[in-house]
């Protein structure tokens, strides 16, 4: 009776979900050093390499994938998780002449 309007609103809100338009994020092999020491993954506090910047903290790739399986929002800060990652090309050997 009166619940049909709420069901219609629920279906309309689900169909108008915005698509993911997050900007590409740079993968950091090692986080930038700061005044307060090394940066670690804010979720597991173990990983300190291959970190991705999420709003105001870093996440390792394992924790990022785990969070993306559950939803597109970060469990720590509530912001949208990065889904596009740019991997920088780093030389595997020293440049000639160095």
From Swiss-Prot:
Pfam families to which the protein is assigned, alphabetical: zf-P11
Keyword Zinc-finger: yes
Domain of life: Viruses
Biased composition range(s): Basic and acidic residues: 1-10
InterPro entries from the UniProt entry: RING_finger_Z_arenaviridae, Z_RING-type_Znf_sf, Z_RING_Znf
Subcellular location: Virion; Host cytoplasm, Host perinuclear region; Host cell membrane
Cellular component GO terms held in the UniProt record: host cell perinuclear region of cytoplasm; host cell plasma membrane; membrane; virion component
Lipid-binding residues (covalent, N-myristoyl glycine): 2
Primary site of residence: virion
Record bears the keyword rRNA processing: no
PTM description: Myristoylation is required for the role of RING finger protein Z in assembly and budding.
Motif PTAP/PSAP motif, residue range(s) on this chain: 91-94
Alphabetized UniProt keyword annotations: Host cell membrane, Host cytoplasm, Host membrane, Host-virus interaction, Lipoprotein, Membrane, Metal-binding, Myristate, Viral budding, Viral budding via the host ESCRT complexes, Viral release from host cell, Virion, Zinc, Zinc-finger
Mapped zinc finger ranges (RING-type): 41-77
Disordered as annotated region, ranges: 1-26
GO terms classed as biological process: viral budding from plasma membrane; viral budding via host ESCRT complex
Membrane-topology annotation of the record: Lipid-anchor
GO molecular function annotations of the record: RNA binding; zinc ion binding
Family in the record: Belongs to the arenaviridae Z protein family.
Subunit structure: Interacts with protein NP; this interaction probably directs the encapsidated genome to budding sites. Interacts (via RING domain) with polymerase L; this interaction inhibits viral transcription and replication, Z partially blocks the product exit tunnel for the releasing nascent RNA product. Interacts with the glycoprotein complex; this interaction plays a role in virion budding. Interacts with host eIF4E; this interaction results in eIF4E reduced affinity for its substrate, the 5'-m7 G cap structure.
Domain remarks: Late-budding domains (L domains) are short sequence motifs essential for viral particle budding. They recruit proteins of the host ESCRT machinery (Endosomal Sorting Complex Required for Transport) or ESCRT-associated proteins.
Free-text function comment from the UniProt entry: Plays a crucial role in virion assembly and budding. Expressed late in the virus life cycle, it acts as an inhibitor of viral transcription and RNA synthesis by interacting with the viral polymerase L. Presumably recruits the NP encapsidated genome to cellular membranes at budding sites via direct interaction with NP. Plays critical roles in the final steps of viral release by interacting with host TSG101, a member of the vacuolar protein-sorting pathway and using other cellular host proteins involved in vesicle formation pathway.
Protein name as it appears in the record: RING finger protein Z
